[in-house]
């Protein structure tokens, strides 16, 4: 049996599909697994041992359309469910199952605060697409695999961070997901432990501000490492503090203790850390304004008088980090 899994973006969503790959391999041993994603996210799956072929596109499925048709797939698992993935399904003469995105329910939740979403994690909803071919969930969490060049040697870190540290992920794709810079600096001061800040090049400036405010016990690694190298640093950390972003899901895949911080988005969307390490916590603001503000976190606060982050004090975050 030859199966094509389709998920184009983004990093976190792709990580959340990894149980689908695993259960296909384990429950259909002779299956040939192909995966189609965007080229810029290739590294997330590049070293996955259960993927027989990883296909990528830059923008349009026409880039690989003819080659995919030649593969004669037996089944397509569409975990993106958008116009682009529907074009893939239409190109291939194969049975397909499609993930239900529940866009209407999410719109009702963000617009009117009517929560009609099922109490079910998106991973379990991804896995339900396999029931028609006799494959079931295994309750084993997420997977993440690194290549040899992705591993960051502890001896390559600044002195003081080589024997253990707290990882704080300050990055995030949208502003409504970002715990404020000054509050993050206060968390660093309160925990009194070595801290490595993780994020992309766009987060370097905020990281520098945190180091300036919190002192030499904080190392700003934002933009210094690739995504996979950042995952390697997560692997070496004692605990991970993170916004709702791709590295949060990678940390859960590594079974780290994850302290996840939620602002404009909410765990009820079904995207919380999936089966992370023991002692993980979800922290949300206690505030008068109504969350969620948007599905993606690209909208923040309706009322200028309210700032939801005022309802999540640094002392609360620090206490979660220091908890046994």
Predicted regions and their residues:
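Catalytic machinery of carbohydrate-active enzymes
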Residues: 1-324
